[in-house]
From Swiss-Prot:
Pfam families: Ribosomal_L33. NCBIfam families: PRK00504.1, rpmG_bact. The keyword Ribonucleoprotein applies. GO terms for molecular function: structural constituent of ribosome. It comes from the Bacteria. GO terms for biological process: translation. Belongs to the bacterial ribosomal protein bL33 family. One of its GO terms (cellular component) is ribosome. This is Large ribosomal subunit protein bL33A. Keywords: Ribonucleoprotein, Ribosomal protein.
Amino acid sequence: MAVKKAALACTVCGSRNYSIAASKNRTQRLELKKFCKHCGKQTLHKETR
């Protein structure tokens, strides 16, 4: 299984706060509720490619 690097971007301010190792076999983008240091609160973060 191949692994690639991907970033998690805040949906509110757009900053890329987290980097993850994601499988290339997955077709849907990952969505997690994480803390954004720029917004100062927990927001939805989506995987960017």
